[in-house]
Amino acid sequence: MNKILLQCDNLCKRYQEGTVQTDVLHDISFSIGEGEMMAIVGSSGSGKSTLLHLLGGLDTPTSGDVIFSGQPMSKLSSAAKAELRNQKLGFIYQFHHLLPDFTALENVAMPLLIGKKKPAEIDARAREMLHAVGLEHRATHRPSELSGGERQRVAIARALVNNPRLVLADEPTGNLDARNADSIFELLGELNRLQGTAFLVVTHDLQLAKRMSRQLEMRDGRLTAELSLMGAE
């Protein structure tokens, strides 16, 4: 069994607006190992995106904790969480969130710039990742000049440019057609094999989820089961 990379212990999330209290997540506990590929499957509104925000340190749980590489996030300062996100975590979203005025190469390089790497290292690593996602020939193109599938590949290259230990992906193929969605998941699997990066993908698509090594189901803010999707149609 792979060494545990990230662990959730009884995560709960509650929002309060005036006298109205909304419980979004209920006692979420699970772990993901080094280099593992896991899917969390659930319909819209089931709490999947909220969970990813907690795992990435973008939001704070009402109770419970997230432990990354043996370190409780509750013990980290805001600056330490930001450094963790820059150095150890990658994020992929349904919408690519590329900067429109920057080229593909510049978008991929952004986490390295934030991390204050040396210029030569930034350029070499960003080009290496564009090559890894098959877009080195599009390095000087802006997002408006790329197809939807190409934009998402650039977003994936950006997420992986710092060689993170874990990538959190929120419906990464939600805006793509079936052919491009299939291509993106093939790419994630290849990058997992080549770099040993762990992936946690939330999705409502069973066909895509079954490509991952483990699948958990979320309903109404609760993890309800570990799924077996080998025969999913």
UniProtKB/Swiss-Prot annotation:
Compartment(s) of residence: Cell inner membrane
Subunit structure, interactors included: The complex is composed of two ATP-binding proteins (LolD) and two transmembrane proteins (LolC and LolE).
Similarity section: Belongs to the ABC transporter superfamily. Lipoprotein translocase (TC 3.A.1.125) family.
Enzyme class: translocase
Alphabetized Pfam families for the sequence: ABC_tran
Upper classification of the organism: Bacteria, Pseudomonadati, Pseudomonadota, Gammaproteobacteria, Enterobacterales
GO BP: lipoprotein localization to outer membrane; protein localization to outer membrane
Membrane topology: Peripheral membrane protein
Keywords (A to Z) from UniProt: ATP-binding, Cell inner membrane, Cell membrane, Membrane, Nucleotide-binding, Translocase, Transport
PROSITE patterns: ABC_TRANSPORTER_1 (PS00211), ABC_TRANSPORTER_2 (PS50893), LOLD (PS51244)
GO molecular function: ATP binding; ATP hydrolysis activity; transmembrane transporter activity
InterPro entries: AAA+_ATPase (IPR003593), ABC_transporter-like_ATP-bd (IPR003439), ABC_transporter-like_CS (IPR017871), ABC_transpr_LolD-like (IPR015854), LolD_lipo_ATP-bd (IPR011924), MacB-like_ATP-bd (IPR017911), P-loop_NTPase (IPR027417)
Top-rank taxon: Bacteria
Protein name according to UniProt: Lipoprotein-releasing system ATP-binding protein LolD
Keyword Mitochondrion (UniProt): no
EC numbers: 7.6.2.-
The ABC transporter domain, residue ranges: 6-233
Positions bound to ATP: 42-49
Cellular component terms (Gene Ontology): plasma membrane
Function comment: Part of the ABC transporter complex LolCDE involved in the translocation of mature outer membrane-directed lipoproteins, from the inner membrane to the periplasmic chaperone, LolA. Responsible for the formation of the LolA-lipoprotein complex in an ATP-dependent manner.
